[in-house]
Amino acid sequence: MNEALQSAVITGPTGAVGLALCRELLHRGWQVYAVCRPGSARAGRLPQHPNLHKIDCDMSQAAMLPGLIPSGADAMFHLAWGHTMGEGRNDMLAQNENIRYTIEHIRAAAKLGCRVFVGAGSQAEYGRVEGLLQPGTPCFPENGYGMAKLCAGQMTRVEAEKLGMRHIWVRILSVYGPGDNENAMVPSLIRALLRGECPALTAGEQLWDYLYSADAAKALAELAIKGRSGGVYPLGSGRAVPLKEYVETLRDLICPGQPLGFGQRPYAPRQVMHLQADVSALRQDTGYAPATPFAEGAAQTIAWYQENP
């Protein structure tokens, strides 16, 4: 598959992946319809570009999108999802609503004339796995968030078949970059180090796969064009190193010599100790080759947080 696409709807455009995807598609010359929650405080982060059109529409109102985007679009990237952190991940009714909203968005995509739906899944669909995460790795999610993502991916795949659309489901691992959720590890650690604090940390022995947001965005764009319909693609760098090394890199970029509180916090219950994507299917179908070393992406992310305290 190598589909010619020129326009896209992006839900959830103000997070790390969404912002990077907006920039990537604009760089390719696409028309981008960035769907934001009305009154979103983060909408000001969106790139200022004549081909970017901000659409105010709550996630619960997907049926309104065809009327708000009368010109239609070629693709939809559905990144929006509620209750992604903390106790909200096990709010089962809220996660069930996320499933419904995802189904409503693929139906809206069909009415917009979209030929492909790219949905943002999660490594949480797998649960705890020792070894590489592959498209066919059995899924045993351990929280409502992962369960709902798995269900949404399966249900929208069936909807896509009924609607005559291509369907791509991307199980995103750990992406970092400008605009990331401030409660995620990389931004929370950056902010603490910029304040001169000594953050309390686990021992940092987890083997972890981090991917810079710009590389994730390129992968999503290429999957929309070339991805196999019905395909599931784990998305990471394909390389895992001890979490401690990432932390030390951030420290060395911000405040070399600053003490770090390794071992001051216990591991969480059901802590994932090995997170790593097998990107061979992604590479085979799209030519995927992440280009940003962690130190380089981290430096760009730190600069963004210094400009956006």
Predicted features along the sequence, with ranges:
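N-terminal Rossmann NAD(P)H-binding glycine-rich loop of SDR-like oxidoreductase domains
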Residues: 8-28
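SDR active-site strand-loop-helix element
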Residues: 11, 35, 76-79, 117-123, ...
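N-terminal Rossmann-fold cofactor-binding loop
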Residues: 35-40, 59
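NAD(P)H-binding glycine-rich loop region in Rossmannoid oxidoreductase-like domains
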Residues: 56-97
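Conserved Rossmann-fold NAD(P)-dependent oxidoreductase catalytic core, especially the SDR/UDP-sugar
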Residues: 103-144
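NAD(P)-dependent short-chain dehydrogenase/reductase
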Residues: 131, 154-208, 213-218, 222, ...
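Active-site helix of classical SDR
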Residues: 144, 148-151
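C-terminal substrate-binding subdomain of Rossmann-fold SDR/epimerase-dehydratase oxidoreductases
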Residues: 197, 201-309
